[in-house]
Amino acid sequence: KVKGYIDQGVAEGAELLVDGRELSVIGADGRPSQGYFLGPTLFDRVTPGMRIYQEEIFGPVLGVVRAASLPEAMALIDAHEYGNGTCLFTRDGEAARYFSSRIQVGMVGINVALPVPVAYHSFGGWKRSLFGDLHAYGPDAVRFYTKRKTVTQRWPASGDARRASFSFPSGQG
């Protein structure tokens, strides 16, 4: 199913920067593993009319949507029927605070490519991204009926020439 999203994104005109469809995994025995593997995929120039924008893809596929202004970007995100997660790359702390406090999604990344929180934060979205009733008893019931938001941020030191990292944080400098 995820490969179908990648195929659809290409067909609809998104710019495919990293193609994970032909990933080959070498097993412990040194031979190619048998199985179904899909590598990271990165699209640029994704637009709201594309299926890869409209649907949640639970696989290693990331789409970049460009907006001319912060209000335009926020309007696109808030109008979307799902509210799982979104990211903003900026050097403007005021814009980051404004964005993270007002955007209507459950997980926000500031200067991180994936707004996936560590285990003690909420993992989940708002709107149609939240399904099920698994948290309806005891202390989880309070959390279930409360809109929670996780904001993950990274602020490189001024003048830091390192390129943006698109991987999970590590202990390496």
Region locations from a protein language model:
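Cytochrome P450 fold signature focused on the C-terminal beta-domain
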Residues: 16-28
